[in-house]
Regions:
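Hydrophobic N-terminal alpha-helices or hydrophobic patches in metabolic proteins across all domains
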Residues: 1-131
Length: 131
């Protein structure tokens, strides 16, 4: 399938998606862009204990939004999957954070809009997992 998007200059682009892609229900307005929180679905979604959250930059190199990688086996697997959904010259990758699923759920359903990269939240910094 293809995902269509609008560039900052107003032009329309599209990507061929390599993984299932969507958003979490009941999170509209919580994403940095004011939309729902986006998610890529990996092959092990039924058994995942951890979530990998990618902080993405815009064309100016500033934080744009976070993308959730759910159902991936490792940080490396999640990053590779994320990058596979963008062109070879994509420079939007900023950081990736591995956190336990229960910590992520608390962050996901908070009552405020995301204003900074996922990796910058103090509660996340204390709970992150390093590989």
């Amino acid at each position: 399938s293809y995902r269509q998007y609008k560039n900052e200059d107003g032009s329309i682009g599209k990507n061929q998606m390599k993984h299932h892609y969507g958003y979490f229900t009941n999170t509209t307005g919580n994403g940095k862009d004011g939309d729902a929180v986006d998610v890529f679905i990996g092959p092990n979604v039924e058994n995942c204990e951890y979530v990998y959250v990618v902080d993405q930059n815009n064309e100016q190199g500033e934080f744009d939004e976070s993308k959730v990688m759910l159902g991936f086996n490792s940080t490396e697997h999640a990053k590779k999957a994320y990058m596979a959904n963008y062109s070879a010259d994509w420079t939007g990758f900023r950081a990736i954070t591995k956190v336990p699923l229960n910590v992520f759920k608390k962050w996901l359903y908070r009552k405020h809009k995301q204003r900074k990269p996922f990796s910058d939240y103090t509660t996340i910094k204390k709970k992150r997992i390093t590989e």
